[in-house]
A protein has these predicted regions:
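Conserved phosphate-binding loops in nucleotide/dinucleotide-binding enzymes
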Residues: 75-78, 873-880, 945
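An acidic, gly/pro-interrupted, aromatic-rich
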Residues: 168, 172-177, 275-277, 285, ...
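Residues that flank catalytic or metal-binding motifs in active/ligand-binding sites
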Residues: 49, 59-61, 83, 140-142, ...
């Protein structure tokens, strides 16, 4: 009998935990005369007791029971020799303990079962070729969402109100209401309908003029024409594009600990908005999202669609450890797989990364087939231009580049001559350099005592830093008195004042490197010079004899990329700030680096004539550079890099890239094998073809998931609740549809309409279900508390973006500029990691629609964040709606809303006249609430204005529920 060490024995004690069966069967009854039937007797036993903990994705004890070969490779089974098969040892009851090692958490196997396994091994352990055992998920291929679309006839019911018998949508809805003895609500008022429809399609309030015109229009098709107008309005794409950006987790920073801005991701946002406005077929959108670079190589409007795969968070630290780097790469592709599965198919495919899905029929093999599909996709930017544009640009640039190269060649010849002369005299120069070079961590200069009211540091030369973006830096600047108890009289707390221009890197905070940091007495924060001079004014004239300054006293930021190093300087003092006396300089210090050494030689040796010649060359080169800069670069967009990555591709055991299991190839998911024709590609197939085949499979006519998920999303965004209330999970852990026949009817309508969305949206909005009032009825709520069955229109609070856009719209400040780079509601500082600080002041550049905000991950934006705008580190297929004290405080006290209260008051005075208080009140109610004030409201508003002012009324109305809730 083969013996195993105790440690391995302990590992095996995790085997045989009870699972649901892959092959449903009763406990086998052995027949001692017939040969053991593996599929009927052994497979059910292993699946029922063992496979959960011992499968390719979860090899506890380094054992997988999925295939005969994997059991043999682990050393647990020797066909024909049960006495040498350790598998039998762990399931036998021990004479010492009276227990079997396995199964650990369940009852021991029966003697008949052990005898059956023993016979099977003795007979040679027959195992059908190609058979792999796997655990059974809670939902199988018969799950409702995996079935073909069923075209059910809309129910007919003569008891339904006449206006509910026309639309198929209403007939489906009414049938469910009747089942629960519920009745629909009456039709909403015209004011409620135009407000509901306008917000629903555009995310903006209707204007008072639009409300008045709609209420006045008594024609039968007035409401239909309203919907047609709103669907054609450019604001439609902005609002519905925002919904889709939530689903695809679009963000404009990379997330993780560095979280740096991605400044060129905005073309994807514009592409999404444009696609919705143009009513682009959704199947085409899916293909462009997954393979836009494949089908539209020379069409930027198509290529940009493939940003979908790389618009999520990713770790860009660039870990040098190969194990960690492989894990980061696996996490990056996991984001693509999860988003693809959830956005288009409503399947939580990511749950099968480490093992077969516990709830849905998604194999780990399916996950890694998708992994192979996306293996060639990496985050990054690339130039987007068609060949003609590239050629035209090359023709413009080439002669200028040739001219510049010749100028540089002539300039270099002069510089080389100067450098050669300088090297010949280097020994003589170096004799004069007797002191140690200046150091970043500190420079000390002493000199005979001198009286000073002002002290000035002047840069005379910098050590070259090819990555420098700004001037030199000063951490601390100290001026010490010449007495028995020296004091640093430069300190701000001792009355010192610092003067000097700051240098800012684009995106830094104002004051991030302020000159005052040189005398704050704190090591670390520094001034980055925007001018050669730093001047310190002392509180009173002092006798001084020592000055100390540093670029980086702590030594923690010596490789800082933003600043050069002050290598040459002079120090001067003055009593009046006009006449200056030099007290120290670096003229006799050694160079700080080899590049600085060459520069000093060069400066000492260059003649007046040579300097003049070089200046002339520099002037000509700058002119050529100016002309080159005037030629616009082809756009570089965040669309990802796509490279060929060939197989073999493996399942990662337990999700660990270091533990490679069975091989896989790019292929469709087996989840839909019964209803949709699948595909399987070679491991070395072109990487673009893999993504294109996946996209075509997702939108194939027999795939029931994609249209169902899409139809449900449309329903959710119109009613605030989906037919399936988990929009991105149509599996076992999601909810089942409240109206399954209606969902399939909508799905088929989408397909019949060539995947265009506006027509089905119009049908939804023309339904009586959509046009119901939102009045609460206690009896109905007891049966259907959240109105999923639609006995009324579910009221909702506006989203954070809608609230912000509404405030700007009613004040007349909304900037409707479409497209292009976004604006920021935060200040952005990048110094290896990024920091985002919400703005405290808001100018016209921030008054665009919120969809154009540069939506950085984890960047808190008070109003938007407080009103539940999601963190786009994750997809947000369904937004949460919370009610918190912070929301009321933000609307009442935030600088943005205070500004808009003033703007609104100014608009009311302009629209209604400065002296007509009652007209101002009426106009305010029309703008904010789309109605006239009631008499008691008019009186209360008049009293508030009299007691305070018009701004107070505006502030109060902005803080009302009626503004931010939609009936």
């Amino acid at each position: 009998m083969t013996q195993f060490p105790l440690a391995r024995f302990c590992l095996i004690t995790l085997i045989l935990t009870v699972l649901s069966l892959l092959v449903t069967a009763a406990e086998p009854t052995p027949d001692s005369t017939a040969k053991v039937n593996f599929e009927k007797e052994i497979a059910p036993l292993l699946v029922h007791h063992c496979i959960r903990c011992h499968n390719p994705g979860n090899e506890k004890g380094d054992l997988s029971l999925a295939t005969l070969q994997s059991i043999k490779d682990a050393g647990y089974l020797t066909p024909g020799k049960p006495e040498e098969s350790y598998l039998l040892d762990v399931i036998h009851t021990s004479a010492d303990t009276g227990k079997a090692a396995m199964p650990k958490e369940g009852p021991p196997l029966k003697k008949a079962q052990i005898a059956l396994l023993t016979r099977w091994i003795k007979e040679g352990a027959a195992w059908p070729a190609g058979l792999t055992l796997q655990e059974k998920s809670k939902a199988d291929l018969s799950w409702w969402s995996l079935q073909p679309l069923a075209e059910a006839a809309p129910p007919e019911d003569k008891d339904a109100p006449a206006n509910w018998q026309t639309s198929p949508i209403d007939r489906f809805i009414f049938a469910k209401l009747k089942e629960k003895n519920l009745k629909p609500a009456p039709r909403a008022t015209k004011r409620e309908l135009i407000r509901r429809a306008t917000y629903n399609l555009t995310g903006l309030p209707p204007t008072p003029e639009e409300v008045a015109a709609f209420e006045k229009d008594q024609s039968p098709d007035a409401y239909e024409r309203l919907i047609d107008r709103l669907l054609a309005f450019p604001r439609y794409g902005e609002h519905w594009g925002r919904h889709w950006l939530d689903v695809v987790r679009f963000g404009e920073s990379n997330g993780f600990e560095r979280n740096v801005i991605i400044d060129n991701a905005w073309p994807f946002r514009d592409y999404v908005i444009r696609s919705f406005n143009e009513d682009k077929p959704f199947d085409q959108l899916v293909i462009e999202h997954l393979a836009g670079d494949v089908i539209g190589k020379n069409d930027p409007d198509v290529v940009v669609g493939s940003t979908f795969l790389v618009c999520g968070p990713y770790d860009n630290v660039g870990n040098q450890d190969p194990v960690q780097a492989a894990q980061i790469r696996a996490n990056t592709i996991d984001d693509m797989i999860r988003t693809t599965g959830e956005a288009f198919l409503g399947l939580t495919v990511g749950c099968s990364r480490c093992h077969n899905h516990k709830f849905d029929p998604i194999k780990q093999q399916d996950y890694y087939s998708l992994y192979a599909t996306f293996a060639g996709v990496r985050h990054g930017s690339r130039v987007i231009a068609d060949p003609q544009d590239r050629q035209a640009q090359t023709q413009k640039r080439q002669p200028l580049q040739t001219e510049k190269a010749e100028l540089l060649k002539q300039k270099s010849a002069i510089e080389n001559t100067i450098q050669q002369r300088a090297e010949q005299k280097s020994a003589a120069y170096e004799k004069e350099w007797t002191r140690e070079p200046a150091k970043r961590t500190g420079v000390e200069e002493t000199f005979p005592p001198v009286t000073a009211k002002y002290v000035r540091l002047t840069s005379q030369g910098l050590d070259t830093n090819p990555r420098a973006m700004t001037g030199y830096r000063v951490d601390e600047f100290e001026v010490w008195t010449a007495d028995d108890r020296p004091q640093n009289v430069a300190l701000a707390r001792n009355g010192g004042k610092a003067t000097g221009a700051n240098s800012r890197v684009a995106g830094d905070f104002a004051g991030a490197y302020d000159v005052g940091l040189t005398i704050d007495g704190k090591i670390g924060a520094c001034w980055i010079a925007g001018s050669p001079d730093l001047t310190i004014e002392l509180k009173a004239p002092q006798t001084i004899n020592r000055i100390v300054f540093s670029s980086d006293r702590s030594g923690a930021a010596m490789s800082n990329y933003k600043a050069t190093f002050l290598a040459e300087y002079k120090l001067e003092v003055s009593t009046d700030g006009k006449t200056w006396q030099e007290v120290a300089s670096s003229h006799n210090r050694k160079p700080v680096s080899s590049s600085h050494r060459r520069k000093r030689f060069y400066d000492l040796e260059v003649t007046v004539e040579e300097r003049s010649q070089l200046n002339e060359f520099n002037k000509k080169i700058r002119e050529v550079d100016r002309q080159l800069a005037a030629i616009p670069d082809p756009p570089s967009w965040w669309v990802g890099h796509h490279s060929q990555v060939n197989g073999p591709f493996h399942i990662f055991v337990g999700g660990n890239p270091q533990r490679k299991g069975e091989t896989v190839v790019p292929a469709s998911m087996t989840t839909l094998n019964k209803v949709t024709e699948g595909y399987k590609l070679d491991a070395n197939s072109p990487q673009g073809q893999r993504r294109l085949e996946l996209a075509r499979w997702i939108v194939s006519k027999d795939n029931p998931l994609t249209p169902r998920v899409l139809a449900n999303r449309l329903w959710y965004y119109h009613f605030g609740t989906g037919i399936v209330s988990t929009p991105s999970d149509f599996g076992y852990m999601g909810t089942k549809p409240s109206h399954p026949e209606l969902l399939d009817w909508l799905s088929l309508q989408i397909q019949k309409n060539d995947w265009r969305l506006k027509d089905i949206q119009k049908q939804i909005m023309l339904s009586q279900a959509y046009q119901q009032a939102s009045n609460f009825r206690e009896d109905a709520a007891r049966i259907d508390s959240d109105s999923r069955l639609l006995w009324r229109f579910p009221p909702r609070r506006l989203s954070g973006e809608e609230i912000r856009d509404t405030l700007l719209s009613v004040t007349g400040k909304l900037n409707l500029k479409m497209g292009g780079p976004g604006f920021r509601l935060y200040e952005y500082l990048q110094d290896n990691v990024a920091t985002y600080v919400p703005l405290e002041e808001f100018g016209p550049e921030t008054y665009r629609r919120a969809v154009y905000h540069q939506n950085a991950r984890a960047a808190r934006v008070d109003l938007l964040t407080d009103f539940d705008c999601p963190d786009n580190a994750f997809a947000a297929p369904r937004r949460n709606t919370t009610t918190t004290p912070l929301q009321a405080l933000t609307l009442m006290n935030h600088q943005f809303t205070l500004d808009l209260s003033r703007f609104l008051a100014a608009r009311l005075r302009q629209d209604a006249g400065t002296e007509h208080v009652d007209q101002q009140i009426v106009r305010a109610f029309q703008l904010l609430y789309s109605r006239a004030p009631r008499s008691e409201e008019q009186q209360a508003a008049r009293a508030l204005i009299a007691a305070s002012d018009l701004e107070a009324l505006c502030r109060a109305m902005i803080n009302s529920n009626e503004l931010i809730y939609l009936d």
